[in-house]
Structures are given as C-alpha cells and as structure tokens.
C-alpha cells in the first residue's frame, strides 16, 4: 500500500486537496468493509480519521448500498440539522473508487441484496495532524513512539545541552 500511496495517490490528492494535506500524506490505514446478510447492511453518517479517504468497490453482485456524501464535519451548521437533500448518492462500480476529504460527512445506504466489499484507505498527513487532530479538533500533545502511528509525528526535543 505504501508504494501506491507514495507514487500515485499522493500525486492525485496533491492536486485535488493541496490545502488539506493532499501532497503531504505520509501514512495510511487500509481495510476492507463488508456489507451483507451476515454483516452490516448500512453505515450511519460519519467522518473518517483521515485527511483523505479512498473507497474502492471490490465487487458488483449487489443492489443498493450507495455511498452518500455531503457537507464537511467542520461546517458551522450542525450535522444534525442537515437534510437528506444536502447529500449526494454515489453508485459503486467494480474497480472504481471515490476520493474524498476525511472530514466530509458520509455513510452507506441499506444494501438491498447481495454482498458488497470495499477497500477503504485512510491517508494521513503528519504535517496537518501535528497542528490539529481531525477527530477532537485540538492541538495534539505528542509522545514519540517507535514504528508508525496514526499520522502524527513527534520531533526530538533537547532537554539539556552543554554550555
């Protein structure tokens, strides 16, 4: 996934969302969501823990389950005051994806028949996240850890120096 993000998706998102971390995406979380009789059949309105999200349809043997997308979470009007007419329904097509800002409110309408799988990639920018956490809307208090995290990074701080 890292080469896909670095070589291709970052180029696209850099053009689409330059002011929202699109060109500085440096980490990701990828997972598959499943909808069907033995799983969830819909998904309530929400926003993602990402600067940019890619949602790719992995099959086409289903009906219903459209993705609906609308206003930004950070818009001044409360999401609870939103009306259904403010949202746009997007059909899933095998192998096709939708790229949107993580803060864009969205959900999935009920699946009517079949089983649907989607690859979801949450892409994150430490440049953006180090200034403001997209989930709590506060400046993060970072602690350095090994490995990769959720798009945050902490720089080393000298706590003493020789004079």
Enumerate the language-model features and the residues they cover:
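Fe(II)/2-oxoglutarate oxygenase catalytic core
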Residues: 1-94, 103-163
